């Protein structure tokens, strides 16, 4: 009888935990289309008409893509992948490229859609990446692309709380 009572008690406790876990609703911050557009326009204006700018939301979906008048066609994919790399690793794509240049973490470079090139910057609220921006095609190279991406984020910094 005591074994049966213990079994019933354990099942009741497990049932209480599982039903309360299902009842929780996640609340996540994400980048709005207006914020994404402001970041992209600012980054494009800071750089040159030759760049492409991609802004992704927290799930890696493209929110905004701007291609400058003189941008090369391949810059769309490069900008998106730089932004994706920054988003998924929550650091600039240049920092990630340095970190994965050799050693045990070098294998991360073979993951789909990541790219070891600078020009991608995460959009952070505390420790959470709510989006990212990536640029490609700046005549000053990856350092200029990163600076332009950061200028775009700086434009909305007061809203990132």
Locate predicted features.
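Bacterial N-terminal signal peptides
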Residues: 6-17
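Flexible, solvent-exposed loop/hinge segments and secondary-structure transition points
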Residues: 22-161
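Positively charged n-region of N-terminal signal peptides that target proteins for export
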Residues: 1-5
């Amino acid at each position: 009888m005591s074994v049966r009572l213990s079994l019933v008690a354990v099942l009741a406790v497990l049932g209480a935990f599982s039903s309360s876990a299902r009842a929780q609703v996640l609340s996540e911050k994400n980048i709005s289309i207006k914020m994404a557009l402001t970041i992209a326009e600012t980054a494009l204006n800071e750089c040159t008409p030759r760049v492409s700018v991609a802004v992704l939301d927290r799930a890696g979906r493209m929110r905004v893509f701007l291609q400058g008048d003189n941008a090369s066609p391949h810059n769309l994919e490069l900008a998106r992948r730089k932004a994706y790399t920054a988003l998924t690793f929550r650091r600039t794509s240049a920092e990630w490229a340095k970190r994965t240049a050799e050693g045990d973490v070098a294998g991360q470079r073979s993951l789909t859609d990541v790219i070891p090139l600078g020009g991608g910057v995460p959009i952070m609220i505390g420790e959470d990446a709510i989006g990212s921006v990536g640029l490609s095609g700046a005549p000053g190279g990856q350092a200029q692309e990163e600076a332009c991406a950061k200028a775009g984020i700086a434009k909305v910094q007061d809203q990132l709380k």
